[in-house]
Design a protein with these regions (language model features):
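Extracellular glycoprotein-like low-complexity segments
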Residues: 207-363
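N-terminal secretory signal peptides that target proteins for export/translocation
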Residues: 1-22
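Flexible, surface-exposed loop/linker segments and immediately adjacent secondary-structure boundaries
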Residues: 43-212
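Bacterial N-terminal signal peptides
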Residues: 25-37
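Sec/Tat signal peptide C-region and signal peptidase I cleavage site
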Residues: 37-43
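Low-complexity, charge- and small-residue-enriched intrinsically disordered regions
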Residues: 17-24, 141-142, 146
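The N-terminal extracellular segments of secreted preproproteins, especially immediately downstream
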Residues: 13-15, 30, 173
Length: 363
């Protein structure tokens, strides 16, 4: 096996990331957390979602109310359940249609509606406070919706990658990386329709003002041919974004992007305000040579770009450490400016991704 790397300059290296190719999967395998867990089903009817603890301690309040209790990894959650995260904890809610909701630290959400089916789904998540990130699968029925709701607005998408943040002062911010996002007022009137890469801030007395969205100013981006499955494991070695099989992508990283571009290339982009190291894992879907692209971006503009080539056999895996070079000294990951990416050698690996959870087929 041979691996070679080269560096390229110029802003035309990366292509527009906003073309998605989602496929409905039922049952679906979703890569989630560090232990394989079984889904609990009561009364013969599968609950609409399961809850995973990605990091720290997560608490739940059942629909009937009461005191918040520690959540268990893989427990079912039903309509009316509240999920709460602490300062250093992150939760993942996986719905039976394959859509996922990542609940960021210091957040509180309520599952208000979860009518989930093979061809049609209607999900509403109330964001009481904090930040959430959702990967919404595309279903056959064009009427299917996934909504993030606050007291002041509802952000609704058919499929894509969306997020929202609810502040204690009732300010509601929502954004989309993929998929048109409808921002509706409580009356049902459309306040705005956000295009991929846009955000809007809903605040009392302020008009809609869509603007560019960056979860972090800096980003790490990988492009591969369709014959190679890329996954980026974050420095915490818990969260990841990428492709775990030809038709399944996972996206647990707030502000990240996973999809297929207009030229059929697999694309993974994650926020990168820390040096890392990030771990890139490549899995072959067929025998033969490959050429991948790795680069760093600042506010959406490429600042460092590399090409890496090699050979890969079907089912084999290669891994490399990616370390980002940051300008100046800053403790703010959101505004840190990346200047380059250092790529370690691609080597054979038996490193396993952080576990899998099987979601039972929805009747």
């Amino acid at each position: 096996m041979s691996v070679a790397a080269s560096r390229r300059a110029g802003s035309g290296f990366f292509r527009c990331p906003f073309h998605l190719s989602w496929r409905t999967l039922a049952p679906i395998l979703v890569c989630t957390w560090s232990l394989a867990v079984s889904v609990q089903v009561f009364g013969g009817e599968p609950a609409p979602a399961i809850l995973g603890v990605l990091d720290g301690e997560v608490k739940v309040i059942p629909p009937e109310g009461g005191v918040a209790k520690p959540a268990s990894n893989g427990m079912t959650v039903t309509v009316g359940t509240r999920v709460q995260t602490g300062k250093k904890s992150t939760a993942l809610v996986t719905f039976l249609d394959g859509s996922t909701l990542t609940v960021q630290p210091e957040s509180d959400v309520t599952i208000k509606q979860a009518d989930v089916g093979k061809k049609r789904s209607h999900v509403i998540v109330g964001v009481n406070v904090g930040t959430v990130w959702a990967r919404v699968v595309k279903l056959v029925d064009p009427e299917s919706t996934f909504s993030l709701q606050s007291n002041t607005a509802t952000a609704t998408v058919h499929d894509g990658l969306i997020g929202a943040r609810q502040e204690p002062d009732n300010t509601f911010t929502c954004w989309t990386r993929a998929g048109d996002l409808w921002v509706l007022e409580p009356t049902g009137r459309a306040r705005a329709i956000l295009k991929p890469g846009q955000m809007d801030i809903v605040k009392a007395g302020a008009p809609s003002n869509p603007q560019a969205f960056f979860s972090n100013h800096s980003a790490l981006r990988v492009e591969t041919p369709v014959s190679v499955l890329p996954v980026i494991l974050m420095p915490d070695r818990v969260r990841m974004a990428g492709f775990t099989d030809p038709d399944t992508d996972v996206n647990h990283v707030f502000g990240s992007y996973t999809g297929i571009d207009g030229e059929g290339q697999r694309v993974v982009e994650v926020p990168a305000g820390v040096s890392g190291p990030f771990t890139l894992i490549l899995q072959g879907e067929q025998d033969g040579p490959f050429l991948i692209r790795i680069g760093a971006l600042y506010k959406g503009v490429p600042v460092d770009q590399h090409q890496v080539s090699g050979t890969l056999q079907r089912g084999a895996r290669l891994a490399a450490q990616l370390t980002l070079q940051l300008e100046g000294m800053t403790n703010d990951a959101k505004t840190a400016k990346v200047s380059g990416v250092m790529i370690g050698p691609l080597e054979s690996t038996d490193l396993q991704l952080p576990g899998k959870v099987g979601v039972p087929e929805n009747p």
